[in-house]
Amino acid sequence: MVQISEVKGNKRDNRTAAHTHIKGLGLKSDGYAEKQAAGFVGQAAARESCGVVVDLIRAQKMAGRGVLLAGGPGTGKTALALAISQELGTKIPFCPIVGSEIYSAEVKKTEMLMENFRRAIGLKVRETKEVYEGEVTELTPEEAENPLGGYGKTISTLLIGLKSAKGQKKLRLDPSIYEAIQKERVTVGDVIYIEANTGACKRVGRSDAYATEFDLEAEEYVPIPKGEVHKKKEIVQDVSLHDLDVANSRPQGGQDIMSMMGQLMKPKMTEITDKLRGEINKVVSKYIDQGVAELVPGVLFIDEAHMLDVECFTYLNRALESPIAPIVVLASNRGMCTIRGTDDIVAAHGIPSDFLARMLIIPTTPYEADEIKRIVRIRSTTEGVSVSDAAIDKISEHGVRISLRYCLQLLTPASILAKANGRSQIDVQDVAECEDLFLDASRSAALLSSEAGRGYLA
């Protein structure tokens, strides 16, 4: 029997994450927040504040400043940061990290902070390329005697004729380009382009003038290029300063045995020196002065900022004042607590008062019952779950009484229980059954403090 198998596409299935439904800040054109828009519900004042921050970032007037999103758990701090990144788009770098991410056995925490700082600073490099583009009308290699002797001949130059909509040119090319043309299997009638700086050659397709030549042909026909044969194209590349650091700290290549062994061995996480960063900053400054490059300060988002210790905050104090610094957005759900790395210094949000004085603080407030109901509806639509009105009321009650996270986590298990009971829609009894199966934090704590908690190790 002939084996036939179905080829599955390489399209990724998007996982429904906690903030998949957030598409932006949901602001009107005048900057005021709508009650419900772009997946956001409530938090009008916080969203409007973030809208002002986004405008400042776009105008590049916010670099080297800090914003703190402060509020209790489940009030939408991470969602606000994600919405800021959605509003800024892909052109402005957005680097999200968690406060505990910077602690490593291999690299200093200050080095990790600086690495993420430079990830959040983009560089827009403009490069002008000279390109010859057109339909090949002539392809003649010119041979010469082999300088090494013998009867063989070598290609000395290559004559190529290119035709575009506005004119025709005959070029004499280097023999190295002939190899590239052979690799691309270029023949007369093909449309190609050649980069003058690098000598790179690319076959675009067959000229559409030859489209009726054959009935059956797996050829892509393209029109003759418009304009002149010789063109100047401006190409814009977006890189981050960290990309430049890494490229210069680990130079590739080298034919000696040590270089070969170094490439085979497992790459160790190494620190990038301040001297190297200083040199890169000089080159970047030179490019900016020449008008070749443009600096794009992005956003560094540090979630759970209370996990940073006093040394990190001291380092951030200095880093924020440097001439090349991104916008730093912190998020913390702590009230008055001890600063990490100190014995008894208590401060608001677990952040030292001198650093807190540099921050613009955006507070988030707990959601009301009506807002929680709306969020449950949005999440049920996002997760593709059908819920009855009575069940939504029941789930929203849990959101008010227990926590928003707990009530949203009940949606998917409740849909599985509903299917097991032969229903397509989640009902109140499915939510009640889910509540019995899965404890919330307060019920679990009450269980441990009661007689039933004696079996646990203290």
UniProtKB/Swiss-Prot annotation:
It catalyses: ATP + H2O = ADP + phosphate + H(+). Keywords: Activator, ATP-binding, Chromatin regulator, DNA damage, DNA repair, Helicase, Hydrolase, Nucleotide-binding, Nucleus, Transcription, Transcription regulation. Its EC number is 3.6.4.12. One of its GO terms (biological process) is DNA repair. InterPro entries: AAA+_ATPase, P-loop_NTPase, RuvB-like, RuvB-like_C, RuvBL1/2_DNA/RNA_bd_dom, TIP49_P-loop. It is found in: Nucleus. One of its GO terms (cellular component) is nucleus. ATP binds at G71, G72, P73, G74, T75, G76, K77, T78. It is an enzyme of class 3 (hydrolase). The keyword Hydrolase applies. One of its GO terms (molecular function) is ATP-dependent activity, acting on DNA. Gene3D superfamilies: 1.10.8.60, P-loop containing nucleotide triphosphate hydrolases, RuvB-like helicase, domain II. PANTHER family: RUVB-RELATED REPTIN AND PONTIN (PTHR11093). Belongs to the RuvB family. May form heterododecamers with RVB2. Component of the SWR1 chromatin remodeling complex, the INO80 chromatin remodeling complex, and of the R2TP complex. DNA helicase which participates in several chromatin remodeling complexes, including the SWR1 and the INO80 complexes. The SWR1 complex mediates the ATP-dependent exchange of histone H2A for the H2A variant HZT1 leading to transcriptional regulation of selected genes by chromatin remodeling. The INO80 complex remodels chromatin by shifting nucleosomes and is involved in DNA repair. Also involved in pre-rRNA processing. This is RuvB-like helicase 1. It comes from Gibberella zeae (strain ATCC MYA-4620 / CBS 123657 / FGSC 9075 / NRRL 31084 / PH-1) (Wheat head blight fungus).
